[in-house]
């Protein structure tokens, strides 16, 4: 069969399957591709093809992830499925696989299990905004009341972590039976995807977000002024826009972009993904430095203290060989620069072992432009020893 070309005209959404080991995440992923393939919206992928996910070395960490793509009537999806629990932790904290929404798979025969809870918590911490539930293995449960109990348990668990548990769509099905081609269960997969289409909103495009550019380098051009270079992370910047210079300083400075240059050509505007030089009015070379960001006025603030979800590299991954304790002072690398910070561990946690993932409070020695969801790495003498994501800002 010739490989059908995916229509790029449909809105694109990134999703993934999450949930406890052996509850059927991979079987469900295979079932979705198989059922949608009948309508011409996917290439059917067998369980074995998905399960044998190649290990990816993403910045020195080994993560196994399966990527599949498929489409419904209205959308194009990229779907990630991870074989192991540790793969989810790494994936979600490093942002290797960005998720606009998740399908939480819970076995109706077993109910919520420890990793069900952990994945819901992780989704909350790293900012997966929407979750749809697939109660799997319903063919193995004859008791309607038992199914309702499991559904209630899952809804309560979601509410406990700040998701709207009462409103979340819950679909009862059997991934295995659907994969085997049984019509009544195939219907449930269609129902699941209809709910995913309706419930998980199309993400805002990067270009529609407020402008932000991390500053990589600064130089002055005689007679013209100071230029800050970097890659636009999000939004659009036009000549004449007023922007703020944020981070590493007591006060934010405000300036006007008087020129935008890319590949030595002058542009009227630049957008997310472009590598540019921005000419800034009235800014002295020494007033601006790498590690600061240029951003739309009022869109982001500099903070020094925050709570973060952190994954500490194991010795095998090139991380530390020994644990660290409270008041550990490594460097935190945000976008383009390292800033020293002090770690506070949660109550009752004495130390953190290589390979752990943990929530901690971090206080930087200088404020940096951050918001919930900002990713960073933890370094010691230029060597990466961990990755993290800002979960909440701590008011100072």
From Swiss-Prot:
Question: What EC number is given for this enzyme?
Answer: 3.6.5.3
Region (G5): which ranges?
174-176
Q: Name one GO molecular function term.
A: GTPase activity
Which subcellular locations apply to this protein? Cytoplasm
Region span, G3: 81-84
Q: Which CDD domains match?
A: EF_Tu, EFTU_II, EFTU_III
Kindly report the protein's main subcellular placement as a broad class: cytoplasm
Extract the Pfam families matched here.
GTP_EFTU, GTP_EFTU_D2, GTP_EFTU_D3
Amino-acid positions noted as binding GTP in the UniProt annotation, renumbered to this chain = 19-26, 81-85, 136-139
Among InterPro entries, the record links this protein to: EF-Tu_GTP-bd, EF-Tu_GTPase, EFTu-like_2, EFTU_2, G_TR_CS, P-loop_NTPase, Small_GTP-bd, T_Tr_GTP-bd_dom
Instruction: Please give the residue ranges the record annotates as the region G1.
Output: 19-26
A cellular component term from Gene Ontology for this protein is:
cytosol
Q: Where is this region: G4?
A: 136-139
Q: What does this protein do?
A: GTP hydrolase that promotes the GTP-dependent binding of aminoacyl-tRNA to the A-site of ribosomes during protein biosynthesis.
Subunit record text: Monomer.
Q: What is this protein called?
A: Elongation factor Tu
Q: From which organism does this entry originate?
A: Bacillus mycoides (strain KBAB4) (Bacillus weihenstephanensis)
């Amino acid at each position: 069969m010739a490989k059908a070309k995916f229509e790029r005209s449909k809105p694109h959404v990134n999703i993934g399957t999450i949930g406890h080991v052996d509850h059927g995440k991979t079987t469900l992923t295979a079932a979705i591709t198989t059922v949608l393939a009948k309508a011409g919206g996917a290439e059917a992928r067998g369980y074995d093809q998905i399960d044998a996910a190649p290990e990816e070395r993403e910045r020195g960490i080994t993560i196994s992830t399966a990527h599949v793509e498929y489409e419904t009537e209205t959308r194009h999806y990229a779907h990630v499925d991870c074989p192991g629990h540790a793969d989810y932790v790494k994936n979600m904290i490093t942002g290797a696989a960005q998720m606009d929404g998740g399908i939480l798979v819970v076995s109706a025969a077993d109910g919520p299990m420890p990793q069900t809870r952990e994945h819901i918590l992780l989704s909350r911490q790293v900012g997966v905004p929407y979750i749809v539930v697939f109660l799997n293995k319903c063919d193995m449960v004859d008791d309607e009341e038992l199914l309702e109990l499991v559904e209630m348990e899952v809804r309560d668990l979601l509410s406990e972590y700040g998701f709207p548990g009462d409103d979340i769509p819950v679909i009862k099905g059997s991934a295995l039976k659907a994969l085997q081609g049984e019509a009544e269960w195939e219907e449930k997969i269609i129902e699941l995807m209809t709910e995913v289409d309706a419930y998980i909103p199309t993400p805002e495009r990067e270009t529609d977000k407020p402008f932000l550019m991390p500053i990589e380098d600064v130089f002055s051009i005689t007679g013209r002024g100071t230029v800050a270079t970097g890659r636009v992370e999000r939004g659009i910047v036009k000549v004449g826009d007023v922007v703020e210079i944020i981070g590493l300083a007591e006060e934010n400075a405000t300036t006007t972009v008087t020129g935008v240059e890319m590949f030595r050509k002058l542009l009227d505007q630049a957008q997310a993904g472009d590598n540019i030089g921005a000419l800034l009015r009235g800014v002295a070379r020494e007033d601006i430095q790498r590690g600061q960001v240029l951003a739309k006025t009022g869109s982001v603030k500099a903070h020094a203290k925050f709570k973060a979800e952190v994954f500490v590299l194991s010795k095998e991954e090139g991380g530390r060989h020994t644990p660290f304790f409270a008041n550990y002072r490594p460097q935190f690398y945000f976008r383009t620069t390292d800033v020293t910070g002090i770690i506070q561990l949660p109550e009752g946690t004495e130390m953190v072992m290589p390979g752990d993932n943990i929530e901690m409070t971090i206080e930087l020695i200088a404020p940096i432009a951050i918001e919930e969801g900002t990713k960073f790495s933890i370094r010691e003498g230029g060597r990466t020893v961990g990755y993290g994501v800002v979960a909440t800002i701590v008011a100072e």
